[in-house]
Curated annotation (Swiss-Prot):
Nudix hydrolase domain ranges (all copies): 32-171
Catalytic activity: isopentenyl diphosphate = dimethylallyl diphosphate
Protein name (Swiss-Prot/TrEMBL): Isopentenyl-diphosphate Delta-isomerase
Lineage: Bacteria, Bacillati, Actinomycetota, Actinomycetes, Mycobacteriales
Keyword terms of this UniProt record: Cytoplasm, Isomerase, Isoprene biosynthesis, Magnesium, Manganese, Metal-binding
Comment on bound cofactor: Binds 1 Mg(2+) ion per subunit. The magnesium ion binds only when substrate is bound. Binds 1 Mn(2+) ion per subunit.
Family, similarity comment: Belongs to the IPP isomerase type 1 family.
């Protein structure tokens, strides 16, 4: 039995793909710049899925964060990677995603967790709307717990207690265009 190695696409400072590396070897104290994606998932009631990272995660264990993050594989679009991770991480069906909207296409961040592990990613941010009747059943090794939150209540919590949330989520939600897109999607529901 062979296990397929998950690859991450490495990037240069201009945002060009320059190669790949196994995901298991990338997140270290000297993490190279690489491609990723970040998602904010809305249910049909317009609530946002907020997840608490599993305690077994290598980086930011137990921290509350956005709905889902991940890495597109070589020759994989962000939309396809989002669907793949939605199935693998959150237990969703591949056709659960009604709409995947890229809101912050040029988002990039670098953050260091308490253990010294670095995240350094070119990480477009997406807003995802789920179909009616879809249920989230996260894998235990990915998500410790989850909540559905009204967008404005989540924004207020992030503003009041940013230390409770992942640094990328706090930074992403400081972008007015992301908050506006979330509120517009919430109001449309």
């Amino acid at each position: 039995m062979t296990t397929e190695v998950e690859l991450v696409v490495l990037a240069d400072s201009e945002g060009n793909a320059i190669g790949t590396a196994p995901k298991a070897t990338v997140h270290t104290k000297d993490t190279p710049l690489h491609f990723a994606f970040s998602t904010y998932i809305l249910n049909p009631r317009g609530e946002l899925l907020v997840t608490r990272r599993a305690l077994s995660k290598k980086t930011w264990p137990g921290v509350w964060t956005n709905s889902m993050c991940g890495h597109p594989g070589p020759d994989e679009t962000n939309a396809d990677a989002i669907r793949r991770r939605g199935v693998d991480e959150l237990g969703l069906e591949v056709d659960s995603f009604l709409d995947i909207q890229e809101v912050l296409p040029d988002y990039q961040y670098r953050a260091v967790d308490a253990s010294g592990i670095v995240e350094w990613e070119l990480c477009p941010v997406h807003l995802v709307r789920l179909a009616v009747g879809e249920f989230v059943e996260p894998l235990d090794d990915e998500v410790e717990e989850f909540e559905w939150a009204e967008p404005q209540k989540l924004f207020d919590a992030v503003d009041a207690t940013p230390f409770v949330f992942s640094p990328w989520m706090v930074d992403q939600l400081s972008a007015p265009e992301l908050r506006q897109a979330i509120l517009e999607a919430f109001d449309a529901e």
